[in-house]
Amino acid sequence: MSTTLYDKIFQAHIVDEIGDDALLYIDRHLIHEVTSPQAFDGLAQKGRKVRRPDLTFATMDHSISTRSLAIDACGPANKLQLQTLADNCEANGIQLFPVGHQKQGIVHVMGPELGLIKPGMTVVCGDSHTATHGAFGALAFGIGTSQVEHVFATQTLKQSKGKCMQVKVNGARPLGVTAKDIILAIIGKIGHAGATGCVIEYCGDTIEGLSMEERMTVCNMSIEAGAKAGLIAPDQTTFDYLAGREYAPKGADWDAAVAYWKTLKSDTDAKFDIVVELAATDIAPQVTWGTNPGQVIGVNQPIPAPEDFSDPIDRDSAVKALKYMDIQAGQKLADLTVNHVFIGSCTNGRIEDMRAAAAIAKQGKVAENVTAIVVPGSVAVKAQAEAEQLDKIFLDAGFEWRLPGCSMCLGMNDDILSQGDRCASTSNRNFEGRQGRGARTHLVSPAMAAAAALAGRFADTRDFIAND
């Protein structure tokens, strides 16, 4: 019987079947300081140990300061989280990459760059953006703290099999259109709950033409479409990225692994529950206008009115979003001034993102009304960017160049916005209060964020590219 990539990975990891559910073996468990403490406590209370510490890797990312290497820089509560993670990892023999370690970084940035994620794996983390790792053809999804404890104890997880949605994107990308624009356009088309109950497989010649870092950006925001996970079949681009990385197979093991990885693709006549198609040629640089990622438009489109939506829930959501974001239907995004710009996160904190933003930043100076920060996703990204002197480009233009961490993606550290602030952000969520109480978040690509920083308002990155 013809099967999808999702089917193949799911079936290969079934340890036992429990009614309509399956007990899946977990190949890789990534942890950080926020969702692991209670799981470790539960384990200790029951007198259990971590079953496979060798398959578990930890980093510090959410609660850390991007201004200082001191673990107490974000206050006593965050320090306690970080110290607790360090103590738990030491007690259980888990590899930890703490603040200051050369391999430290945002969990979904450092994992791939170390070669920890491989095609065909099951990957979990107490973090919703675990879907990032689906870019490698791995079944990767976020889990809750009680599930983190279950994986600690058994290296398995009970799961029900979801539907499979195929998203095809074909055609040449227009000037200035990035992977971030592609995934925002997808979410705009299907809605922020459009893939609920599904695993998305992204395909088509546009997707095949993306680099691994671009594929990670696409898969990262699968959760913002309502999906459990996102997948892209591995190919030569995947193999080239993994070759030589620290935790990648070597020698004969590499040859055997690649031979297996080449089988990890949906059969040509596999049936999908839902099929969605987009033409890349129709996509423009995107900006979210509302309070969920599905409320998104091309940079030169007017902000929609509630009556433009046929669904009553969407209409109500639009009314609330317009009020919260302090914008008007019909208004142009170019009329909106921004006072903050954030470039970073597990969505757009990799070296290609730094390069794209720097290509715009070198064309001017940050506007007087704007505070702009650039936060590399890992120590390795920071080092590479500095080797290419990208940090100098940012600093000369008036951006702040920070230490690695999750930073302003979420209001969980010292990079928090204030009431009424408007931010062009390369992160993944624009929910009310996501970057601080009363703050207004607009999701954009790194190039669009850099353009907004220079213009002091939303600007079409294509104008900057044309002048480069």
From Swiss-Prot:
Disulfide bond entries: none
Pathway named in the protein's UniProt entry: Amino-acid biosynthesis; L-leucine biosynthesis; L-leucine from 3-methyl-2-oxobutanoate: step 2/4
Keyword Membrane: no
Assigned EC number: 4.2.1.33
Keywords tagged on the record: 4Fe-4S, Amino-acid biosynthesis, Branched-chain amino acid biosynthesis, Iron, Iron-sulfur, Leucine biosynthesis, Lyase, Metal-binding
Listed GO biological process terms: L-leucine biosynthetic process
Cofactor annotation: [4Fe-4S] cluster
CDD domains, per the entry: IPMI (cd01583)
Reaction catalysis annotation: (2R,3S)-3-isopropylmalate = (2S)-2-isopropylmalate
Cofactor: binding comment: Binds 1 [4Fe-4S] cluster per subunit.
Protein origin, superkingdom: Bacteria
GO terms for MF: 3-isopropylmalate dehydratase activity; 4 iron, 4 sulfur cluster binding; metal ion binding
Xref: SUPFAM superfamilies: Aconitase iron-sulfur domain
Binding annotation for [4Fe-4S] cluster: C346, C406, C409
Record bears the keyword Magnesium: no
Entry-linked HAMAP family: LeuC_type1
Family label: Belongs to the aconitase/IPM isomerase family. LeuC type 1 subfamily.
NCBIfam families: leuC (TIGR00170), PRK05478.1 (NF004016), PRK12466.1 (NF009116)
Function as written in the Swiss-Prot or TrEMBL entry: Catalyzes the isomerization between 2-isopropylmalate and 3-isopropylmalate, via the formation of 2-isopropylmaleate.
Subunit and partners: Heterodimer of LeuC and LeuD.
Record protein name field: 3-isopropylmalate dehydratase large subunit
Upper lineage: Bacteria, Pseudomonadati, Pseudomonadota, Gammaproteobacteria, Alteromonadales
